[in-house]
Amino acid sequence: MEKLKLLNERIVSRVNANLREFDFDTGQFINNAIEYDKLSKFYCFYGITSHHPIDFYFKHASMAGSYFLGKCAVNQSTIYKSDIRGDELKRKGDIMDRNNPLPLVEDETIVINSSLLYKTLVHSNSHNIETPEEFTIRNTVSSHYANIHGSTIEGCFLGSFSTIDLMNLHSCIVGEFSYVQAGEFFHKRIDPGVIHIENDDFSFQFKYEKAVIDKYIGVNASFQPRGLIYRFVTDKEPEYERLFKVVDLPPVQAPQSSAVNRYAVIKGDTRIGENVLISQGAYLENAHMGDGSNAQENTYIIHSYLVGMNITAHGGKIINSEIGQKTFVGFNSFLFGKQGAKVTVGKGCIVMPHTIIDSDCALQIPENHIIWGYIACKEDLITN
């Protein structure tokens, strides 16, 4: 136990050194989040498939309740109930940068050094052409349900339910419930509830009002999360713990063309169509998954009907809703329909990442629309 505490003190020291210009202390989060007696109660899991090289190295690390897939190297790190997925790691000989077409000299590896990842989803698919053989997370602390998607990170703090998507981040603080996909950032502090998407052809920026963030996913003085979305997720956690405790689970009824991960929760009258993907960590209850749909990691689809060819990206939550054909629901979106007040999204729509829809009356989003931000009534659809 003392060695674990010393390890976390070292991690705090490393991350704080990277963030010293912001006078930010990651120890406030770690000291209040980590319950050391629980770190010895959960196993670590390593997935083995015929498609991924078996290579798992760890040293001076705690990885309680976490799941790994693909080539991974973990050193001087604490990884708690996190999902480290290397299913899109590149292989030796692959070409990453078409403008500089040099093949990889060895298989890409996820490298995690001097970091603490707390209930974090890490998904490979790095776009960092400077380190093609390594998908790196160094000197970084990530909070509850943060999402690191295809992004290399060094010296950062990621707030609860934040998403870093397809970029490189250096010495940055990302506030809770923020989504950033903007190439590369150095030494920036991103406020809570910021949606920032930018490339050569497109720029989108939005910021939630503080009252909205406080209601759905605020944090206290020690950066511990609270709010409606956090309570919604934590209420479902016991269902996942059962998946890791029980060996012989009842089979899920699904066509042979569909894939349902063993570590997904499937409850109630859930129906799965052809060519459907249900990823690890997904939660389905009384859900209809139309042909060609998917529920990615950490998604929740409850009392909802997905017509078909639907994508629900990492962390998306769909409750009491109907989603039209070929509609995309982005990262960490929260579509909170009610009984008698359903959310209906027409076909061909895009629900932008980190969108919140929470209305006490039924809402209808027309076909082929893009929606974003906070939608609490029909009038909000005019501006969002």
Language model segments and positions:
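Glycine-rich hexapeptide-repeat left-handed beta-helix
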Residues: K5-F29, A33-I34, D83-I137, V141-H144, ...
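Short low-complexity stretches enriched in small and charged residues
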Residues: N32-S40, L69-V74, N113, A259-R262, ...
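Ordered hydrophobic segments in well-structured contexts
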Residues: S62, A73, K81, T136, ...
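Right-handed parallel beta-helix
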Residues: H51-F56, E239-G268
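Short, flexible segments with low predicted structural confidence
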Residues: K38-L39, C44-F45, T49-S50, D55, ...
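Extracellular beta-rich repeat passengers
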Residues: S40-A64, F68-L69, A73-T78, D83, ...
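Sequence/structural signature of beta-propeller modules
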Residues: M1-E2
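Beta-propeller domains
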Residues: P255-G292, Q296
